[in-house]
Amino acid sequence: MSILTDFKNFISKGNVLGLGIAVIMGDAFNKIISSVTGDLLMPIIGAVFGGVDFSGFFIRLGAVPAGYTGSLTSYNDLKKAGVPLFGYGQFLTVVVNFVIVAFILFMIMKLAAKLQKELDKTEAKKEEKIAEAAPTPEDIVLLREIRDELRGKK
């Protein structure tokens, strides 16, 4: 086999294609979650806790340099000036994103499990109907009659 044929066989296998689709869907899902978090939930949480953008929340751990003329409330400006900062706001944003993603994935898993359970019940009912509806073959009926006759003679 040539390398091209081997590569074609490798790519055409279901696992590789499924993985590729999962990566693309994961990227799209990440964009949706980022939008839900950044555009919908974080403004509400920020309004409740007094700030719309958590990423700028920080605690100054050291002194501001003597010649500093920037804003004392700007995380980026203070960081560029070399002021030691404890920037917990971005961490809070990432934690909120994680909790939202975990909850949504949990709900998707619960829904998938419920749908699978219903599908299994439907399949079991179909199999029962098929088993009930299928006539017993004549040779089986004959063998049962012979068995019953032999039991009766004992």
Curated annotation (Swiss-Prot):
Homopentamer. Channel that opens in response to stretch forces in the membrane lipid bilayer. May participate in the regulation of osmotic pressure changes within the cell. InterPro entries: MS_channel, MSC/AndL, MscL_channel. Signal peptide: none annotated. This is Large-conductance mechanosensitive channel. GO terms for cellular component: plasma membrane. Keywords: Cell inner membrane, Cell membrane, Ion channel, Ion transport, Membrane, Transmembrane, Transmembrane helix, Transport. Coiled coil: none annotated. PANTHER family: LARGE-CONDUCTANCE MECHANOSENSITIVE CHANNEL (PTHR30266:SF2), MECHANOSENSITIVE CHANNEL MSCL (PTHR30266). Belongs to the MscL family. It is found in: Cell inner membrane. It comes from Zymomonas mobilis subsp. mobilis (strain ATCC 31821 / ZM4 / CP4). One of its GO terms (molecular function) is mechanosensitive monoatomic ion channel activity. It is a multi-pass membrane protein. Pfam families: MscL.
